[in-house]
């Protein structure tokens, strides 16, 4: 069940076992071992994704292994194509696969998650992604809520 699902009735919950598995370990992702990226590139992607999971965790806006797999796959394809450099591919992958999940009301948790995400993206020199999060922060302040899709 996720935020798009209606809540379950007490009758159903009486018969169910609820297991939460939303908190993932980025380091444990099995795809790191099979990636075609260079070791330094893998380290940069892993550090970026670990930082994003940690920044987004308090607001439960983080992501799972499928997103990690897709980010790696996007960068690998970009490397094969030779059209864009690694840093641009990482920025585009984060923008396309992680940032669309960002949304929320103007609460301390969401403010902190957006601030930490913004700081990380600037530190990692992911300019397009950092600019998008800055827009979301502006929306949060001025509108009381923010979402990737405007």
Name each model-derived stretch.
Residues 1-150:
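C-terminal regulatory/interaction module of P-loop NTP-utilizing enzymes
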